[in-house]
Design a protein with these regions (language model features):
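Active-site beta-loop-alpha junctions enriched in small/polar residues
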Residues: 29-32, 59-63, 88-94, 117-120, ...
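Short, well-ordered coil/turn segments that N-cap beta-strands
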Residues: 20-24, 52-55, 81-85, 110-112, ...
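Active-site mouth loops of central-metabolism enzymes
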Residues: 24-42, 85-97, 153-171, 247-262
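Conserved, mostly hydrophobic/aromatic
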Residues: 28, 56, 106, 179, ...
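Conserved N-terminal beta1-alpha1 strand-loop-helix module at the mouth
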Residues: 2-58
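Active-site pocket-lining/capping segments in soluble small-molecule metabolic enzymes
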Residues: 6-11, 133-159, 208-266, 297-316
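Active-site/ligand-binding-proximal alpha/beta "capping" segment
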Residues: 144-188, 262-277
Length: 316
């Protein structure tokens, strides 16, 4: 493992930031598939960097299909920005040896935060989960492996509206507690639309003796077509009041975007008022809606040492 001193933004503690007075704001990106996507991603990264987020994360494609691109983007964020990167890593499609190699790459580089996930079934969400014959079955096993192999902070996923394969909300809470017992320091939720869903999950975890920080995942809806995809991904229907507000302005893209931003702002305000440690924005590699919600919340850019020299954010 390299003994070189790493920049402050790389080794910054996410759990420490979650316990601070300022809400922890973070952004999620996905690795692009082509040059045009790469250009859009880095335009978005540079715009969002100016808010000085607590951390940013880079997703991992289904079945590990984006492994090399995830590693490349995460490494570049660590090298070329002032932001703290977190790499997503999934069990699906990987042997333990392959997982060790990926984790070892990060341990020898500049990434100190990993979001450990089981991952979606290969072939789609409607397919049964089948583990790699030499791999892992559960996210808590991956949490343990990551913790064994380097000085990592490990986050995990949480599901306020119930995981598609889970029999109950209680079962979801029990799985989350097992992940915490394995060494997870915090959780990020799947996107959802009601504060009550978040509070139910948080209360169930606390009732089981855990004070695990749970960051709400929030995705501003910018077009009505997203609603069907969100239902597919979460396994839960979008609440009728949300779909009604968006469908009422369908056909007017600007109005749909404005309503989507307002819905996201209202939810974020409610969650923060209820004590959520922050908001994790699922950006879809685009900045305008995310920046507008950030602006609506009246947040100020953090002052992280050398990062304080970054100019004020460009509002959109």
């Amino acid at each position: 493992m390299s003994s070189l001193r790493r920049p402050e933004h790389v080794v910054r503690s996410i759990p420490d930031a979650l316990s601070g007075a300022r809400p922890a704001i973070s952004f999620e990106f996905f690795p692009p598939k082509d040059d045009a996507g790469e250009a859009l991603l880095w335009e978005t990264i540079r715009r969002l960097e100016k808010t000085q987020p607590t951390f940013v994360s880079v997703t991992y494609g289904a079945g590990g299909t984006s492994r090399d691109r995830t590693i490349r983007v995460t490494d570049r964020i660590a090298r070329e920005t002032t932001m703290t990167p977190m790499a997503h890593l999934t069990c699906v499609g990987h042997s333990v040896t392959e997982l060790r190699n990926i984790i070892g790459h990060y341990a020898n580089g500049a990434v100190r935060n990993i979001l450990a996930l089981r991952g979606d079934p290969q072939g789609g969400l409607d397919q049964p989960w089948v583990s790699h014959p030499e791999g892992l079955d559960h996210a808590e096993q991956l949490v343990s492996l990551v913790r064994q192999l380097g000085p990592f902070t490990v986050g995990v996923a949480a599901f306020p509206d119930r995981h598609p394969e889970s029999p109950s909300l209680d079962a979801d809470a029990e799985v989350l507690v097992r992940k915490a017992d394995a060494g997870a320091a915090f959780a990020i939720t799947q996107f959802f639309f009601t504060t009550d869903a978040y509070l139910r999950l948080r209360d169930r975890v606390v009732a089981r003796g855990r004070e695990l920080p749970i960051i709400p995942g929030l995705m501003p809806v910018t077009n009505v077509r997203q609603l069907a995809r969100m239902t597919e991904l979460s396994g839960q229907p979008v609440p009728k009041d949300v779909s009604d507000r968006l469908e009422a302005v369908d056909g007017d893209p600007a109005a749909v975007r404005e309503v989507g931003v307002q819905i996201a702002t209202e939810l974020a305000q409610s969650l923060l008022a209820e004590g959520a440690p922050g908001i994790h924005f699922i950006t879809m590699n685009r900045s305008p809606a995310t920046l507008q919600v950030w602006d609506n919340l009246g947040l100020e850019a953090a002052q992280w040492g050398a990062a304080a020299a970054v100019p004020d954010p460009v509002r959109s």
